[in-house]
Amino acid sequence: LLALDTTPDEILAIAITHEHTDHINGLKTFLKNSDATLLASKDTLDALIKKECIPTKTKIITIDNKSIDICGIKINRFATSHDCEGSSGYTLTLPDNKKVAICTDLGVMTDTVRQAIMGSDLVLLESNHDIEMLKKGPYPPPLKVRILSDKGHLSNNICAAELKTLLQNGTKRFILGHLSQHNNTPLLAKSCATASLM
């Protein structure tokens, strides 16, 4: 927030993708000091309530199969394939009809995901790991299997394979997201993505 010169009071809503700690760390503290509305799937909200991450004062909106409008921004949820219930990606359609898609923490690109993000002007797409780095890296074998599974994370190769189709369907900009610190580098992710577009 400091880098954006933004205060918690200026945040009107927070959309949570799923319940894993790396995505909700600090949520409770933030919500205690904010009037932001919390958006998530029913399953994710249920998990957050069980983990006592949501202060009682927080306004909650379940966003499963409906569109939510916040200050003229239309927010839609789509299901992602990850190892928790209710894992989500989001599209945001701005008042000028430009569309942004946020899509991380998915082990596989499903038709549901493709349909949801197709035609977005900007897509933030997971490019989590280089497969060889992951296989040779320090993670224990069960974690490697989890990451490589259909409920894990997208590799650079899988991400790159999707970019050309997105580009052909109107996407103008990409952000490669959720890069692993241990199993990837920004240069590897970018090189793989760039090669797929040639």
Please report, for each region that a protein language model flagged, where it lies by residue.
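Hydrophobic packing residues within well-ordered alpha-helices of enzyme cores
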Residues: 1, 27-30, 48, 113, ...
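Core dinuclear metal-dependent hydrolase active-site scaffold
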Residues: 1-6, 25, 63-122
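Active-site metal-binding motif and surrounding structural segment of the metallo-beta-lactamase
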Residues: 1-40
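Glycine/small-residue-rich loop that forms an oxyanion/phosphate-binding "nest" at active or ligand-binding sites
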Residues: 24-86
